Amino acid sequence: MKLTFLGHAVLLISDIEGKYNVIIDPFITGNPAYPKDFQLPKIDYIMVTHGHGDHLGDTVELCKKYNSTVISNFEICNYLQLKGCKIHPMHVGGVYYFEFGKVKLTPAIHGSGIHEGDKVLYGGNPCGFLIKVEGKNIYHAGDTGLTKEFELLKDIDVAFLPIGGNFVMDVEDALVALEMIKPKIVVPIHYNTWDIIKADEQKFKEGAEKLGIKCVILKPGESLEI
C-alpha cells in the first residue's frame, strides 16, 4: 500500500496494484501546499473528517468526476447527498467494512461547521479515521486538540497527526499524543500551509525519536510504502 501526502491534511491511500484509491480531506483547489503537477488517480472513496473548507475541499467536484462514495459523519453526508454525492454516513464509534478495508470513526476535539455563502451549517461532530487496510492500521487524526481518547488507540502502524497549533495541537501537544498512541511510524500534517499554523517539523521529529518512534516527514507529493 502507498500513502501519499498531498499537503495540509490531504492523504491518498492507494493499492500498489491500483485496486482502490481513497482520499482523505481532499483540499485541492486553493490549497497552497498541494503539489500542482500531481496527477490524481480515479478516486473510489472520499473520507471527510469535518465540514471546514480546508478539509471538505473538492469533495463535491471529485464525486461528480469519479462517481466516488463519501464516508463521513451523518450530517456532512446528508449535506453532500443534496449536492449529488453518493454517501455512506457514519458517526464517531461506528465501524464498517468496505471493499478496501475496515473503517472506524474516532473522536476529534474541533468544530465542523460548513460555510455556505453567508451561512454556517451544522456539520455534526468532527472525527478522525482508523483504517485497517491490507493488515495495517492507519490513523488519520483529522483536526484535533489533545485528548485522553488517544490512549484508546492500539497497534497503529502509521499515524498522521496535526502539529500546526492555533486550530489543532502544536508540536508539544502532538508529542504528548504520540506518547499515548505509540505508533510504529508518525507523519506530521496540518502545518506550514499558512503562517498561522507554522510549526517546526524537525523539532517534532526529534521529539518523536526520543520516544523511540520513527517520524517520516513527507513533502507534498511524496509517498510512504508499507
Swiss-Prot record:
The keyword Ribonucleoprotein does not apply. GO terms for molecular function: hydrolase activity. Keywords: Hydrolase. Transmembrane segments: none annotated. The keyword Hydrolase applies. Gene3D superfamilies: Ribonuclease Z/Hydroxyacylglutathione hydrolase-like. Pfam families: Lactamase_B_2. Disulfide bonds: none annotated. It comes from the Bacteria. InterPro entries: Metallo-B-lactamas, RibonucZ/Hydroxyglut_hydro, UPF0173, UPF0173_UPF0282_UlaG_hydrolase. Belongs to the UPF0173 family. This is UPF0173 metal-dependent hydrolase Fnod_0635.
